[in-house]
Amino acid sequence: MKARLPPLLLLPLFLPGLAIAAPSGRDIVLHGNANGALPCAACHGANGTGNPAIGAPALAGLPAGQITAALANMAQGHGGTTLMRSIAAALSPAEAAAVAAYFAALPKP
């Protein structure tokens, strides 16, 4: 008698190939995300030096936890500008953490 595996038991073998990798922090900073978050670099710069003329603070070298907390706060509608609140709301927690890690790893201006 041959043993047969139910087809559902084979599914995990194929799932890794179907997984879609989340964009890196650098990708989000440079290109935004699929949920409508604009590229951070448009205002904060790819190197995180900010743009005082438009009120975009420097983010390079800040602690990742500080950036993540600020994004979470803005995603809840508190602080920041209307534009930043909408961008923060379009980031998943993992994407916000990736963006924060990217900026935290950059040297302070």
Question: Residue spans of the language-model regions?
Answer:
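Extracytoplasmic/secreted proteins, especially bacterial periplasmic and envelope-associated proteins
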Residues: 24-28, 66, 83-86, 98
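N-terminal, post-signal-peptide region of Sec/Tat-exported proteins
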Residues: 45-68
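Bacterial N-terminal signal peptides
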Residues: 7-17
